[in-house]
Amino acid sequence: LHAANFTNCIFDGNNNIEFIIDFVDGGGIFNYNISNSMIQFNDINNSFNDIPQLDFTNPFYQNNILNGNSHFRDPQRNDFVIGEESDAINKASSSAYPEDLLGIDRTLKPDIGAYQHVIFE
């Protein structure tokens, strides 16, 4: 793998750190870009302070939310629709994907993730 681009993604889970970029010594140049995404990375022990690839202020990271509330409907059942309390609402790039996985238009105010948000009942 020589490059990776992530746009409108949610990296979330049960751990404090759910996102890592790791380089292999002698692996060559690796280009990456993470934009308009929400990343769970709560480094409570400051274990990754000296790793430049995980400096979320560098230019490889653009318009991201760090440690936001995804507010998934039912992640234990793989239902990753986001609800009205999600920090991902209206934060995505509409140019990347004009529709969500259900075919709902997302050109005006797109949400980060695979689905536009809904109001849970």
Q: Where do the protein language model's features map onto the residues?
A:
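Surface beta-loop-beta hairpin patches that serve as ligand-binding interfaces in beta-rich domains
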Residues: 78, 83-121
